[in-house]
Amino acid sequence: IDALDYRPNKAARDLAGRDNYVLGYVYDNPNAYYILAMQNGILKECRSNGYELLIHPCDATNPDIIDELVNMVNSARLAGLILSPPLSEMPDVLQAMDDKGIQYVRVLSGDKAPDDKPCVLVDDYQAARQITGHLLDQGHQRIAFIAGEKQHHSTTERQRGFYQALADHGIQADPELVIDGTYSFGTGVQSIQQLLALPEPPTALFACNDEIAAGALFGARMQGVDVPEALAIAGFENSPFSTQTFPPLTTASQPTAQIAQRATSSLIRSLQARKRKAENHTITADIFVPELIVRESTSR
């Protein structure tokens, strides 16, 4: 087989039995860098295990989202799904998948698995505490926070970590320094204008992702604000945005491709266990803690 460089034909293999060798990645996320990293990680694991990948973008707010997903799984004869936020955090979607017997793995924000189903966790809370703690260690006390969409649990976890770090240093969060937004460059631009217009503007800013932080940096520089001397700015995710700005952004490195690869591996193991009818298959939740990366945007 090795000498002939034989590769099993997926279509023939599917027809020969009842096993399917196609996985689906379903997402609703406007962050192109995140989606690309997820796809690369999933594809790497699929290729290593003889699986194909179907990528399906969707709108999580669509009232027919459950029917859309079930029909997609059935028509494509998918073996299982990889779900990322916010779809991975929607109970009605997960319940529908369970009811239909569709296997899936979730990428979730948190440090503890919510149930015994396959998932990979990202500890956004601890990473946000580290970022905020870094800003506090730099001597900042008026620290602003710009949030992403509330339907993403990562937003609430990062905001919770921000609040906890302030509390750890005996500082009460100022509500006028906390702004709700979306995970977008435009949110950063608009929010920094609002913050800089305050009678006492912040001296530091923690943005919920790098795209928001880049927008805030752009908006601050447009107003002649010196970053980091007058305003320190930190983001989250260590996306290409974080190194394409001037100055480069302090951030938390989130190994998205590795997270996606681990999630895919977990799903494939579950599929193989079902095929073997293994009753003692142990499901473990892998936890990733994003790592603080200090760059010039917060270095005085």
What are these regions (language model features)?
Residues I192-R300:
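Flexible loop/turn connectors
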Residues G24-V26, R77-P85, A144-I146, V178, ...:
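Periplasmic-binding protein-like
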Residues I65-Q126, H153, E157:
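Short beta-strand-centered segments that line the small-molecule binding cleft or hinge
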Residues D28-A37, I55-I65, S109, C119-Q130, ...:
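Hinge/beta->alpha junction and helix N-cap segments in small-molecule ligand-binding domains
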Residues Y6, A60-P63, S84-E89, E211:
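Short beta->alpha connector loops
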Residues L4-M72, A79:
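Amphipathic helical "hinge" segments at domain boundaries
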Residues D64-L78, G188-P201:
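Short, well-structured alpha-helical segments in soluble
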